[in-house]
Amino acid sequence: MLLYSFPGSPTLFYGDEAGVQGFEDPLNRGAFPWGSEDAALTDFFRTLGQLRRTRESLRSGALRYLLARGGALAIERECGGERTVTALNAGDAPADLTLAWDAPTAQDAMTGQRFLVIDGKAHLTLPPLNGVILV
């Protein structure tokens, strides 16, 4: 998620989108797993690519760091009034985040999950090793 949210071109190592894992030579250059790709992971990367393609803020928006605490990080990309916020939890415990938000709800563009906004603040609890892209 972070790779697709930062400025610049997202670049994946060969096979990452299909679940190929890196090993030592000679196994690190094996054939692509055509027909046995990790379908959920491939769909995840496809959704990320579509989101980046349709959100101008992810392609060319200004970057601003909103929060960095423990394993949690939240960044904002903004362009022409379009705002996209990526919030991640790289920690091994749930992370409670509060982010300023100017709409009645915040929606995760990856899953469609909606988060309630109270008094201009979105309140999220991110599970370990998880994240959202809020629009």
What are these regions (language model features)?
Residues 1:
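Active-site phosphate/pyrophosphate- and oxyanion-stabilizing loops and adjacent acidic/basic residues
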Residues 5-12, 16-135:
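Carbohydrate-interacting/catalytic domains
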